[in-house]
């Protein structure tokens, strides 16, 4: 039977020289070539698929103004700087005009400023005092809420933006957009929608609440300087419960929703909004939810 030459074949940029084969075997040659090429593609894809995913390590995104400080677990306090990596139980501080922005994981970020102090959990934070704004970047995973804790309440956000201000006299929560749930150690629960505010005036509380808070402060003071155990590496330390929480009720006040004019003004002058090189990721959502225009340049 006469033989025919098969034209040169291209495989991955290389040329296979012509080989004398029987006509009936031509299809077999092409099938083998296709199989080899396909196998190479599958092997390459499998290599890409099995690459392990690396979690984003917490880090400082920006420090537009000082004073700002960082204290890693077991280390002395140092000046905060952009790009610095952080660990669970790191203590962050700002004073006066100091401001910083921190990236946690899965799109969770926050800004703090003024006389503020905050401690990092693995994916949550504890605001010890001062002001902060926290959010989850649009499009990021919302499998778990971003929890911002204080000794008085925990704000849970899931694809939303919330502002907290915690002083010696009050705790104030402003939900900029979306839905925020606030839960207290005493079992009270509040849900805020876009523009709604919640406040706790510490001076107007009952004597029972004041005694409870003093006892809680005493417990916290005793814990200072004690390094966290290895078991505490993933989450913030549990809240102290000096009394049965069901017997202590705090008097919270739902404030009027923020007005359009007030919201517009705050977006234009707030250091936590305008005092950084870039706007927060959820600014357009805030403007849309509250019916606002873009802040003036």
Regions found by a protein language model. Give the residues of each.
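Short N-terminal segments immediately surrounding and downstream of signal-peptide cleavage
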Residues: 55-71
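Glycine-centered loop/turn motifs
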Residues: 81-85, 89-91, 115, 195-197
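Bacterial N-terminal signal peptides
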Residues: 38-47
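N-terminal post-signal-peptidase region of extra-cytosolic proteins
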Residues: 72-88, 95-98, 159
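Short, small-residue-rich packing micro-motifs
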Residues: 92-155, 173-182
């Amino acid at each position: 039977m006469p033989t025919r030459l098969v034209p040169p074949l291209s495989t991955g940029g290389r040329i296979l020289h012509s080989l004398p084969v029987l006509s009936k075997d031509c299809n077999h040659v092409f099938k083998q070539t296709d199989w080899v090429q396909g196998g190479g593609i599958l092997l390459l894809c499998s290599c890409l698929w099995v690459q392990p995913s690396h979690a984003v390590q917490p880090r400082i995104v920006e420090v537009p103004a000082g004073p700002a400080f960082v204290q890693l677990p077991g280390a002395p306090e140092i000046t905060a700087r952009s790009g610095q990596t952080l660990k669970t139980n790191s203590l962050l501080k700002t004073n006066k005009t100091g401001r910083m922005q921190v990236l946690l994981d899965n799109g969770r970020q926050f800004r703090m400023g003024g006389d503020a102090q905050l401690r990092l959990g693995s994916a949550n934070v504890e605001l010890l005092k001062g002001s902060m704004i926290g959010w989850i970047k649009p499009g990021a995973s919302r499998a778990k809420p971003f929890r911002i804790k204080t000794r008085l309440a925990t704000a849970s956000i899931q694809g939303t933006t919330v502002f907290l201000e915690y002083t010696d006299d009050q705790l104030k929560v402003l939900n900029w957009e979306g839905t925020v749930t606030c839960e207290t150690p005493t079992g009270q629960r509040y849900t805020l929608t876009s523009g709604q505010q919640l406040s706790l005036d510490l001076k107007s509380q009952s004597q029972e609440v004041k005694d409870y808070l003093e006892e809680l402060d005493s417990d916290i003071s005793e814990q200072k300087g004690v390094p966290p155990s290895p078991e505490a590496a993933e989450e913030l330390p549990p809240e102290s419960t000096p009394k049965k929480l069901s017997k202590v009720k705090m008097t919270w006040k739902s404030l009027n929703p923020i007005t359009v004019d007030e919201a517009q003004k705050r977006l234009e002058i707030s250091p936590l909004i305008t005092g950084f090189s870039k706007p927060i990721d959820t600014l357009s959502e805030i403007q849309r939810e509250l019916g606002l225009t873009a802040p003036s340049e």
